[in-house]
């Protein structure tokens, strides 16, 4: 029996990709695909924006992975929704420009350019998940604007676009008989979620149900159902060459 070739997959992003305060779909992918030679390296860092991924990209390039999966931008969006959050974010994360779709486009384009120039990796860009579950509120309208940027970059650069938002949107429309709970900003719901999970050992699914969400836990992070959409899209992308 021949030895299976190892496929190294680097995952870039923030807390949703990191999977510590959100359902761990990278761990799920390891369980699904590890036996087939896929090795996942999670370089995501909670709080990162696209700019932070860009300036720390050399660590990924040094690995020379076979695949790179990028899911980053939710923090860019939440900062763009609030001048106060934007100011704090720029100060704490050393973001050099105001938050905008143009700044996001510049950073994401440079990430893809640098990866294409310095590696042979196949690149998958994951569309940003829903932000709150009322699809017609400003947060989700903004998410769709940022996802349009991602889709355009993917088309221009001939890399793969993984339509997670689109799948989640379709699921919510099919399974909700009224508008879902909206994302209101602020940190209270997220802090309570963290206390419930890490102090009282409640699962993300239990917290999600108590908070009245279908795919999310606190309006941003994912329960297991929400995370499965991402895992499924990534697995589909990774298995295309098999």
Where on the chain are the PLM-derived regions?
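Serine-esterase "nucleophile elbow" of acetyl-processing enzymes
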Residues: 1-67
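Alpha-helical cap/lid subdomain in secreted, periplasmic
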Residues: 2-5, 35-36, 52-242
